[in-house]
């Protein structure tokens, strides 16, 4: 695979490397929009300025910039608060959609690292927030509940430190088992601004063609800033085969939910990771990933962790103090 010494700068935002040499390097923006590839590896390189994400591809044909069969690695230079999980959904807001009615979603949590929004979360009990495992920070995190406008110190807000991070034990930094519980240092005070969202009573499969709610404070577009107010959008569930065609082995049909969106109704983007997918008023998923820098591209399905699959794990973790 690729090594750090093989990386070469090809733009201010990207480095590239190949395992078999490069015949010609082009600026990343010159790559075809619909580049037929198979995602094969992703590296995390921890440095003083945050995590660097490298995504490697094996092209299915001889491209203008490589020899046939070479491996390309694209290194995304991103600060930790905007850490991207394949897509950037992990530091994300809603593309399109609309501003939520203030405090209409009292279960929404903003996970903050160094006082900056990094991920979404869902309050599921007064002492637990559910989110994505890839949202785990390298240092202390604070959960902000009862918020609408993150620029303000609203009286409705409750800021509670995370006492313990409890990611799934099988999460390895890839895309499966991407679920985590946050044990709060203090119990949240339940009121009209802060209220847990119930988990499904029993596991059920999620049907295709369902319109589902998503919400978050993430980016409003690939090159746009984070939203400071809570936004919401609508995503529509797709057959698992649609995601399997694009994401290959990285899409686990039992563990994940596949969705699409239109730009008017909105969809997830960087910073929305860990937020909810709510179908028929029931919590069904956790925002996980989509294509890097392509959160507003409807060619690439969005992926959510399937809560139904992990219900036994969630309940066991919350009921057993020694586990979380």
List the predicted regions and their residue ranges.
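Cleavable N-terminal signal peptides of Sec/SRP-targeted secreted and luminal proteins
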Residues: 10-18, 59, 67-85
């Amino acid at each position: 695979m690729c090594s750090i010494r093989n990386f070469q700068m090809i733009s201010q935002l990207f480095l590239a490397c190949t395992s078999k040499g490069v015949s010609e390097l082009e600026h990343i923006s010159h790559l075809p929009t619909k580049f037929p590839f198979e995602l094969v590896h992703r590296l995390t390189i921890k440095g003083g300025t945050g995590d660097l994400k490298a995504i490697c591809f094996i092209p299915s044909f001889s491209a203008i910039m490589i020899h046939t069969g070479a491996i390309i690695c694209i290194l995304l230079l991103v600060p930790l608060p905007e850490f991207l999980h394949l897509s950037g959904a992990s530091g994300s807001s809603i593309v399109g959609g609309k501003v939520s009615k203030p405090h209409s979603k009292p279960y929404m949590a903003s996970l903050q690292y160094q006082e900056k929004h990094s991920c979404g979360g869902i309050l599921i009990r007064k002492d637990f927030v559910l989110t994505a495992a890839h949202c785990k920070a390298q240092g202390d995190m604070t959960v902000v509940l009862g918020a609408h406008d993150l620029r303000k110190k609203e009286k409705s807000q409750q800021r509670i430190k995370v006492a313990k991070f409890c990611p799934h034990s099988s999460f390895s930094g890839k895309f499966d088992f991407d679920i985590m519980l946050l044990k709060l240092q203090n119990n949240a005070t339940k009121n009209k601004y802060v209220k847990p969202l119930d988990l499904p009573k029993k596991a059920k499969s999620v049907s295709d063609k369902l319109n589902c709610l998503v919400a978050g404070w993430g980016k409003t577009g690939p090159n746009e800033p984070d939203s400071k107010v809570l936004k919401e959008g609508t995503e529509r569930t797709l057959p698992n085969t649609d995601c399997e065609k694009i994401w290959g082995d990285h899409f686990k049909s039992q563990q994940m939910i596949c969705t699409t969106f239109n730009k008017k109704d909105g969809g997830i983007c960087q910073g929305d990771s860990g937020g909810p997918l709510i179908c028929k008023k029931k919590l069904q998923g956790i925002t996980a990933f989509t294509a890097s820098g392509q959160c507003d591209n409807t060619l690439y399905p969005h992926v959510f962790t399937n809560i139904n699959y992990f219900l036994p794990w969630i309940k066991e973790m919350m009921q057993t103090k020694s586990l979380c």
